[in-house]
């Protein structure tokens, strides 16, 4: 198989899955938070590939998934509604779109390393922007000639972040495995705008697509990550984390690629750069893991000393040091000696200084900004719909220049990291052929 375009797909059915019990009228209005209002209305997807070793019939799998999805939506009722005017969700039980697709190939054919980036697109509905009449959430069940199946769940980023997606899918999977018993879906914490109060007249446009970009994946084995951590320790960095060392390493490779692209295109000097890191606020705010919404913020640091890219030790210490300073500043906002409610409101006010939408303005600033989002340590590989554990978990979100997603990736009994990297087309060749990168990464 030379190209993913050779794969024939067949849509067998589309249906709307509604909550198994109607949502009370008193819960029909669910306010978006200030964070939600500043997020673009784009779908983000998580996809799970299962080999289905027990050979479950697809009709049985479909029925169980749909029934358990309906049951799960009773607790996650906003997901079955519609976002209105970037202000609130009308929880009208319209339902979640469920698409059943036959993919006419064997699963292993599209899970070859060179095709996995395309495989993640093949198993999801071909949709990115959430229109006013679109389902807030989507599901696609894909089944292959070999009997393998893939389950993709997508939801508007307007109402959910990665932690919310994980909570929902965990509950859905648990319900699927336990339909015959008295299992109750765990009750999610629907915080609405209680922490980050909604504001009137917040206008959020469409996602600033980056059409001249290309996305590729790179794998870092546990051994490669340990090598990076060992080097960081040699440089004098105390207790470096996996994400810290990989962030610094990828920034260096990307910056070198940027210098090379600027030189090849006669663009003069390359730009200084900023490192932007998305952060889950639940631990900082002492909120339950299954709190629903965009409970995230960002911390970032501008690296002015761009020449240090040529000196590995100085560059690594600079990036990790600056990120730790920015992270500490964010942590300190949540550690005030105030009562719980007052502390939440104070935190919300402080976060206005770190406006969650501000990093999108980097597109119009004379700086090379890299946005990192880590899904590491989220147990996506434990998701079991009664089909065993997934052989691969992927995520998909719209192309955004200099966006780098980090996820756990299984290497035997241990986990390395899979990096999904989006760069400008003219920068990617220099990046993926960088000898330093290739000494640590594989495809």
From Swiss-Prot:
Q: Where is the signal peptide?
A: none
Q: Tissue-wise, where is it found?
A: Expressed in cortical cells of the root tip, especially in hairy roots, as well as in etiolated seedlings. Mostly expressed in roots, and, at lower levels, in leaves.
A GO term for molecular function: O-acetyltransferase activity
Keyword terms? Acyltransferase, Alkaloid metabolism, Coiled coil, Cytoplasm, Nucleus, Transferase
Answer yes or no on keyword Phosphoprotein: no
Q: Which reaction does it catalyse?
A: (+)-minovincinine + acetyl-CoA = (+)-echitovenine + CoA
Q: What's a GO cellular component annotated to this UniProt protein?
A: nucleus
Query: What Gene3D superfamilies does UniProt report for this protein, alphabetically?
Result: Chloramphenicol acetyltransferase-like domain
GO biological process terms, alphabetically, are: indole alkaloid biosynthetic process; response to jasmonic acid
Query: For this protein, what is the EC number?
Result: 2.3.1.-
The pathway where this protein functions is:
Alkaloid biosynthesis
The UniProt induction remark is:
Induced by jasmonic acid (MeJA).
Which Pfam families does this one have?
Answer: Transferase (PF02458)
Q: Is Metal-binding set as a keyword in this record?
A: no
Which family does the record claim for this protein? Belongs to the plant acyltransferase family.
Q: How does it assemble?
A: Monomer.
Per its record, how is this protein called by name?
Minovincinine 19-hydroxy-O-acetyltransferase
Record the organism: Catharanthus roseus (Madagascar periwinkle)
Read off the lineage from the record.
Eukaryota, Viridiplantae, Streptophyta, Embryophyta, Tracheophyta
């Amino acid at each position: 198989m030379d190209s993913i375009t050779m794969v024939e797909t067949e849509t067998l059915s589309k249906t709307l899955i509604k909550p198994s019990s109607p949502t009370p009228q008193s819960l029909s209005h669910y306010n978006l938070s200030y964070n939600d209002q500043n997020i673009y209305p784009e779908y983000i997807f998580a996809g799970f590939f299962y080999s289905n070793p027990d050979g479950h019939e697809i009709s049985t799998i479909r029925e169980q998934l749909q029934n358990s999805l309906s049951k799960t939506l009773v607790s996650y009722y906003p997901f079955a509604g519609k976002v209105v005017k970037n202000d609130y969700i009308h929880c009208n039980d319209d339902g979640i779109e469920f698409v059943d697709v036959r993919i006419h190939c064997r699963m292993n054919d599209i899970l070859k390393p060179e095709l996995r980036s395309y495989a993640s697109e093949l198993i999801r509905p071909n949709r990115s922007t959430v229109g006013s009449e679109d389902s807030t959430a989507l599901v696609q069940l894909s089944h292959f000639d070999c009997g393998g199946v893939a389950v993709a769940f997508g939801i508007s980023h307007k109402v959910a972040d990665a932690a919310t997606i994980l909570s929902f899918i965990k509950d859905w999977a648990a319900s699927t495995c336990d339909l015959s018993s008295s299992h109750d879906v765990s009750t999610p914490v629907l915080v609405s705008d209680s922490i980050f109060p909604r504001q009137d007249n917040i206008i959020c446009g469409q996602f600033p697509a980056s059409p001249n970009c290309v996305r590729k994946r790179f794998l870092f084995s546990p051994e490669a990550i340990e090598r990076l951590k060992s080097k960081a320790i040699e440089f004098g960095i105390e207790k470096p984390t996996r994400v810290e060392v990989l962030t610094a390493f990828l920034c260096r490779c990307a910056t070198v690629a940027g210098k090379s692209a600027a030189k090849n295109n006669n663009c003069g000097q390359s730009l200084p750069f900023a490192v932007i890191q998305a952060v889950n606020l639940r631990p900082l705010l002492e909120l339950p893991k299954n709190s629903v919404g965009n409970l995230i913020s960002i911390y970032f640091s501008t690296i002015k000393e761009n020449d240090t890219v040529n000196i590995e030790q100085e560059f690594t210490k600079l990036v990790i040091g600056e990120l730790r300073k920015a992270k500490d500043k964010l942590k300190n906002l949540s550690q005030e000696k105030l009562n719980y409610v007052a502390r939440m409101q104070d935190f919300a006010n402080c976060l206005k200084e770190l406006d969650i939408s501000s990093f999108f303005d980097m597109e119009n600033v004379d700086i090379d900004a890299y946005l990192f989002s880590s899904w590491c340590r989220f147990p996506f590989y434990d998701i079991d719909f009664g089909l065993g554990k997934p052989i691969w978990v992927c995520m998909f979100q719209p192309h955004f220049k200099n966006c780098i997603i980090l996820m756990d990736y299984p290497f035997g009994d241990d986990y390395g990291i899979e990096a999904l990297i989006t760069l400008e087309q003219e920068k990617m060749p220099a990046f993926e052929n960088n000898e330093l990168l290739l000494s640590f990464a594989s495809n």
